[in-house]
Regions:
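A short helix-to-beta-strand connector/capping loop
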Residues: 2-3, 21-22, 113-116
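N-terminal glycine-rich anion-binding loop in soluble enzyme alpha/beta folds
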Residues: 5-70
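Residue-level detector of anion-binding/catalytic polar loops
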Residues: 25, 84, 145
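A short glycine/small-residue-enriched secondary-structure motif
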Residues: 45-52, 75, 80, 107
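Glycine-rich phosphate- or other oxyanion-binding loops that anchor nucleotides, phosphorylated ligands
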Residues: 56-94, 99-103, 150
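Active-site histidine-anchored catalytic micro-motif
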Residues: 81, 90, 96-151
């Protein structure tokens, strides 16, 4: 078994079942729709049909990035198991999530000095981001090391 985990954001544009099958945990962005905040949990809290029906009826969604505290809560269980983390974020050009991830990384590196956390700015979104995650999972599944996957 690899001593690292590859993680991403829910904005990766891949289905929940695919991410679970490929063992790619994801941290949820959040959005507000009709005054109610939802986690972007890939259709668990609200189905895509309901989501798009609300938009068709005039609702306007707003989104919020993952903050550093959410990253800490998301990553800490992996670190407690002794796993290094390779996390790929949504492009820093359209979200502050990369900066939040870097703040969490610095905090957790002090708490877990013997483990590695690498944060990669995908510089992409949607399908391009998803393809990158699929490629990284392929490398990991072929037995590539943490450092090789990061490179």
């Amino acid at each position: 078994m690899n001593n690292f985990v590859i993680t991403c954001c829910s904005t990766v544009d891949l289905e929940k079942e695919y991410l679970e099958k490929r063992n790619i945990p994801y941290v949820c962005f959040h959005y507000t729709l009709d005054g109610i905040e939802y986690p972007d949990d890939l259709g668990v809290s609200i189905s895509a049909d309901v989501f798009f029906d609300k938009i068709a009826k005039g609702a306007t969604p707003t989104t919020s990035q993952v903050n550093s505290e959410q990253y800490i809560k998301f990553w800490e269980p992996f670190l407690e198991k002794g796993q290094n983390i390779l996390h790929v974020t949504l492009s820093s050009g359209i979200s502050g999530s990369y900066n939040s991830a870097m703040l969490a990384k610095r905090y957790l590196e002090e708490k877990y000095p013997n483990l590695k956390i690498k944060v990669v700015d995908s510089l992409g979104a949607s399908s391009g981001y998803g393809l990158l995650m699929s490629y990284l999972a392929d490398l990991r599944d072929e037995g590539k090391t943490f450092d090789a996957c990061y490179e």
